[in-house]
């Protein structure tokens, strides 16, 4: 028998500035299922995580709420831990990056990098808010795009035209925090010399540690040459002060991944059998896996392994990267009620419904996953209630009535039982590869075969026939054993159902190896319902409650929504100036990603009697570009064409919103036609 594997697993650290939602839960459920599978196989799998608890955003929110940053992160951490526990995510340790372990490790790693010559310093000129007396990160500066003239754009890129620029290039810059006009001020910054590790990273990213599509994307960065990474922020800042640099703090993305190490070290202090260096040392034979979303690949696949290499630690065995969550084919929306918080879901529905649905859709790739709510109801009701639980509910009553609850050891269908046993290695292989959807398909195919066989044997009919009691018990006994096999295969996904099934079966917690054995002449406990069907009305109630969450949040704000404060109405223009802008209705015929562009989508537009090609910086809000195809939008037709490195953009489509995921492409009422002028 082979030695148990030593495996350390992490999920990305949720930011301690807001609630967990169903998009977040995709990653934690995925990770938890994989870790539970490893533990069932007898491996030493350890799952650690923590709240990402540093940064200006946390400091500013705490200030607005009149509490300390420590009070804020403690409250958010408690909320996060409650949500995860109720979703059956079983961390071995859940810590915080604002911890002594993380302070010590961050300082030690920095000092090792400095000693090895991988730290540089140089003055940086950046915007400073004179009212708040703080330097402003790019996202805290708003102004007019220097390229296309669109107002209310962030300090590093324009969501309208996709241009990137330095914050100092913005026209009419304003602090997004105070509204003050920022001033330029020089400050000494600390940099990590990422280019020192370029050769290592080129080799490591092609070593099999990454999915191929992720490695290909990173190759673009590596081929264009790496830049030094700014790892410092100036006071005031909520975080750890850099050693020997008063008033300078580690940038949150330096100490956040070190939080993985800190959480594990915190666990080691409570579990003496665990050796920190055995998992993190340069020559560690343990496996280390990070489950992350595709939006934070650069930090984990470039900066993080370079930091570990430079400080004398081991690198990850692999990064397991997943895509985004959409709901009903579109990005999560607060107004539609599909931006669902974890707690709102839990108030209405069983967490195992979602765990199973995610498992049925998750593959090993980085494709986005769509939570289609109608399909969700149908799949859970059909697969879990109609197939798996149905086997036990069909058979248990006959065993209790006809044999005092004792399951006999007969095997009336050896070929069927053999099929279940022979399927186990393939299902295990799918779990190991994170092909959860394949595992679920194979498990449900077995459930179909079991149900078909039981229906064919019809124990309910046999029970009415004289002298058929032995056959009834044999059929139902095998039915319960097949149900037990399915429970073993589903246990990583459905731990609560498995625990209830174990109680009914009157057995110790099931391991993966138990699929090789059968129950025989075994006393069962009385059967209790294991799972109920999803009621569509409860899904609707969850959606309505999510809309109410939005309304409550809006009601707690001051009168008005603050948009005019953030972006005051521009200087008055005359009608001729407005009339000079030729706005048209455009039909989006095709919408696609732009290779090599992080923020742009390419839109092919029909404007009635002509076609136009437009690049728009709306990718972050529309992870599925095809969802925009066939939609009407507003188009600036007489904007001068702009040559970009990806091609020529012939105009601009109009959108509202602050940016990021909150970009809303404008559409006319139904009945408008491509080419019509907007007046």
UniProtKB/Swiss-Prot annotation:
GO terms for molecular function: ATP binding; metal ion binding; methionine-tRNA ligase activity; tRNA binding. Pfam families: Anticodon_3 (PF19303), tRNA-synt_1g (PF09334), tRNA_bind (PF01588). Binds 1 zinc ion per subunit. Zn(2+) binds at residues 145, 148, 158, 161. GO terms for cellular component: cytosol. It is found in: Cytoplasm. A motif ('KMSKS' region) lies at residues 331-335. Its main location: cytoplasm. It comes from the Bacteria. A motif ('HIGH' region) lies at residues 14-24. Keywords: Aminoacyl-tRNA synthetase, ATP-binding, Cytoplasm, Ligase, Metal-binding, Nucleotide-binding, Protein biosynthesis, RNA-binding, tRNA-binding, Zinc. ATP binds at residue 334. Signal peptide: none annotated. Its EC number is 6.1.1.10. Homodimer. Belongs to the class-I aminoacyl-tRNA synthetase family. MetG type 1 subfamily. Is required not only for elongation of protein synthesis but also for the initiation of all mRNA translation through initiator tRNA(fMet) aminoacylation. This is Methionine--tRNA ligase. It comes from Pseudomonas paraeruginosa (strain DSM 24068 / PA7) (Pseudomonas aeruginosa (strain PA7)).
């Amino acid at each position: 028998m082979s030695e148990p594997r030593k495996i350390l697993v992490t999920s990305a650290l949720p930011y301690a500035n807001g609630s967990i939602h169903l998009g977040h839960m995709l990653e934690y459920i995925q990770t938890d299922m994989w870790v539970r599978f490893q533990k069932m196989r007898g491996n030493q799998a350890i799952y650690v995580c923590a709240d990402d608890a540093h940064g200006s955003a946390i400091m500013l929110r705490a200030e607005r709420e009149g509490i300390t940053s420590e009070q804020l992160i403690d409250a958010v951490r408690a909320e996060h831990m409650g949500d995860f526990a109720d979703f059956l995510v079983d961390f071995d340790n859940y810590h915080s990056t604002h911890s002594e372990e993380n302070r010590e490790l961050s300082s030690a790693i920095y000092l090792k990098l400095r000693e090895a010559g991988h730290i540089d310093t140089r003055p940086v000129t950046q915007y400073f808010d004179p009212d708040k007396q703080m330097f402003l990160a790019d996202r805290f500066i708003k102004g007019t795009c220097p390229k296309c003239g669109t107002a209310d754009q962030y300090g590093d890129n324009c969501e309208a035209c996709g241009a990137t620029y330095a914050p100092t290039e913005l026209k009419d810059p304003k602090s997004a925090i105070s509204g003050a006009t920022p001033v330029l001020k020089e400050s000494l910054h600390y940099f990590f010399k990422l280019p020192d590790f370029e050769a290592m990273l080129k080799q490591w990213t092609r070593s099999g540690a990454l999915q191929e599509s992720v490695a290909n994307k990173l190759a673009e960065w590596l081929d264009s040459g790496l830049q030094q990474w700014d790892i410092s922020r100036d006071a005031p800042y909520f975080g750890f002060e850099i050693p020997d640099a008063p008033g300078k703090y580690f940038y949150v993305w330096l100490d956040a991944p070190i939080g993985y190490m800190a959480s594990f070290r915190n666990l080691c202090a409570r579990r003496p059998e665990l050796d920190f260096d055995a998992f993190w040392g340069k020559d560690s034979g343990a496996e280390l896996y990070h489950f992350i979303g595709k939006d934070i690949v650069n930090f984990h696949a470039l900066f993080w392994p370079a930091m570990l290499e430079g400080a004398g630690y081991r690198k990850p065995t692999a990064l397991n990267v997943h895509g985004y969550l959409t709901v009903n084919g579109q990005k999560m929306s607060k107004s539609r009620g599909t931006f669902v918080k974890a707690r709102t879901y839990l108030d209405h529905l069983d967490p195992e419904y979602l765990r199973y649905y995610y498992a049925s859709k998750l593959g090993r790739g980085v494709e986005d996953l769509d939570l289609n709510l109608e399909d969700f109801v149908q799949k859970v009701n059909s697969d879990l209630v109609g197939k798996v639980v149905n086997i036990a509910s069909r058979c248990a009553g006959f065993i209790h009535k006809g044999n005092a609850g004792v399951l006999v050891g007969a095997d009336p269908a050896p070929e069927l039982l053999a099929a279940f046993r022979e399927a186990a290695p393939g299902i295990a292989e799918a779990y190991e590869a994170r092909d959860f959807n394949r595992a679920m398909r194979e498990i449900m195919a077995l459930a179909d075969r079991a149900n078909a066989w039981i229906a064919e044997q019809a124990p309910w009919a046999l029970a009415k026939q004289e002298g058929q009691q032995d056959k009834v018990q044999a059929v139902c006994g095998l039915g319960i054993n097949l149900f037990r096999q399915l429970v073993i295969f589903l246990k990583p996904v459905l731990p609560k159902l498995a625990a209830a099934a174990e109680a009914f079966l009157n057995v110790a917690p099931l391991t993966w190896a138990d699929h090789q054995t059968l129950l025989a002449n075994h006393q069962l406990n009385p059967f209790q319902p294991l799972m109920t069907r999803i009621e569509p009305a409860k899904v609707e109630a969850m959606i309505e409650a999510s809309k109410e969450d939005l309304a409550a949040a809006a009601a707690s704000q001051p009168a008005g929504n603050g948009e005019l404060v953030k972006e005051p109405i521009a200087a008055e223009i005359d009608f001729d100036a407005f009339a000079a802008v030729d706005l048209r209705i455009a039909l989006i015929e095709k919408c696609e990603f732009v290779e090599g562009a992080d923020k742009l989508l390419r839109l092919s537009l029909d404007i009635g009697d002509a076609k136009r090609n437009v690049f728009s910086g709306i990718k972050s809000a529309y992870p599925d570009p095809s969802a925009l195809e066939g939609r009407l939008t507003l188009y600036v037709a007489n904007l001068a064409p702009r040559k970009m490195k990806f091609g020529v953009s012939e105009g601009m489509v109009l959108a509202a919103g602050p940016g990021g995921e909150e970009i809303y492409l404008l559409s006319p009422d139904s009945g408008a036609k491509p080419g019509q002028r907007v007046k």
